[in-house]
Amino acid sequence: MTANVDGVPGKFATLGLTYDDVLLLPGPSDMAPDEIDTASYVSKNVRVNIPLLSAAMDKVTESRMAIAMARQGGVGVLHRNLSIEDQANQVDLVKRSESGMVTDPITIHPDATLGEADALCAKFRISGVPVTDGNKKLLGIVTNRDMAFETDRSRQVREVMTPMPLVTGKVGISGPDAMELLRRHKIEKLPLVDDDGVLKGLITVKDFVKAEKYPNAAKDGEGRLLVGAAVGVAGDAFERAQALIEAGVDFIVVDTAHGHSRLVGDMVAKIKSNSSGVDVIGGNVATRDGAKALVDAGCDGIKVGVGPGSICTTRVVAGVGVPQVTAIYEAALAAKEAGVPVIGDGGLQYSGDIAKALVAGADTVMLGSLLAGCEESPGELMFINGKQFKSYRGMGSLGAMQTRGDRKSFSKDRYFQEGVASDEQLVPEGIEGQVPYRGPLSSVVHQLVGGLRQSMFYVGGRTVPELQANGRFVRITSAGLKESHPHDIQMTVEAPNYSRQ
């Protein structure tokens, strides 16, 4: 940013603007809102159908939220306040939730017990498991129907499974042909085998049903839902990244409160040099120089935002930050030159703020408080005075950084406090609270994307790049902000996409 205000050089940077300081100017439009394409890029190689990410926070994104986000066309970023094993398992759950073909299906040995088969089905939320020998040769299949009336859970799978020969398909079978086999034989699972009878994949009828139900889902090249995951810069960060990549994650986010740090650049470079095919995103930054440093480190995406979140206190505890519209604009100036997408992280209150972030230079936005109240978020549901709320907290809050019994916090190094000896010495940069319960994610996303489509229609942008090119801001006063909200009326019924904050 230029160190100049009203022609006076010195320590003062440019004027900082945030979402409430600006509006978008309407422009000529030749399309209807339903003709608009909201697809965009999270990173150089990860494309989503709606420009929304759920935040890597322990009250926002675990596997259930990530699955729901990808089905709506966005993507979830799994938080890292988990053990390495747990976070990798979360990635696996998302990847196995649906696919065109399961290339590495869960299997069970014929000598396993029915109790073990039950536990496996419960863990992965599946209704049946192929039975294979030690060489992965298909021996049969065991399903819920096979086990339903078996009271002795110590019996072996081989005693109740449906043995070969089964209806199977060859590797490379087309979708329509697979669907025809499932329909003709009235089965739910179609194992795919090679000429030697070795199991190579699995197609289920549920995947076809889900594909029809969620036509806008964001998927990888194998038809699996997209998912990202966060890592830090200290301790087990590199080991964690390797485990996540092995589990099938689509991108890694090196997630810290201060991305303009040598430690972040070093970790990005280390992950990039030791893995291929997985994009690495760095953050968070709020300046042009910070974004350029991450570009130089090899980032495939840049996350922008220092202190804009509703639960963040960095700007008052540390006195550091940049209002979010200006932060995105400045970071994008460095990122766009290198073809690196920008993620606007935090500070969004309404659907209109999404469009403002995109016009400022973001390619996608990351949402925390707007999604924390959803049914799929991992926050605790509570009732207060007859109303429903869900717990929400910053990853820099005491609750997120403290050790609870045997549960270790993996969040401290996000704020570079991993070396703090005791919880009493932590310096929090966030708070804990609750947000109103908002129902299923699908309803919330419908309103957010609907608002974005209206913004693109008003501005005159058929695609996100067109919105970015055509969008222009007008700065407003406090009176202009007051005029922008409903006024001179007592609101009796809240709209699903508006409440006075």
What is each stretch, according to the model?
Residues 1-28, 108-109, 170, 177-180, ...:
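Alpha/beta catalytic cores of nucleotide-metabolism and tRNA/nucleoside-modifying enzymes
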Residues 34-48, 55-57, 86-126, 131-133, ...:
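Bateman/CBS regulatory modules and CBS-like beta-alpha motifs in cytosolic regions of diverse proteins
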Residues 47-54, 100-105, 164, 220-230, ...:
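Short beta-strand/loop segments at the ligand-binding rim of alpha/beta enzyme cores
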Residues 64-67, 239-244, 286-304, 344, ...:
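Catalytic cores of alpha/beta
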Residues 71-86, 195, 249-261, 300-318, ...:
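Glycine-rich phosphate-binding active-site loops on the catalytic face of alpha/beta enzymes
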